[in-house]
């Protein structure tokens, strides 16, 4: 399963690690923060520097063929917008961080 995660912070990186450990998932992690991207590159996944609200960044991350998109940044408004954009680019299940905390 291809999972695209926007946000390489504690929540996003933790989800990515858990999904990679299952060994059934390909994970792409996307973040605007250069330091977060560098830290995440230590794991066995594709890590991209980019904005989750940038159509081209999502396409580069593989959103058009992704099975799941997870917006896990600490900015709820951006998470919601990113889920909408991801859904527009490819019909799949969008999950935002708030859904994970309930």
Residue ranges: model-predicted function:
Residues 1-102:
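Cytosolic regulatory regions of ion transport systems
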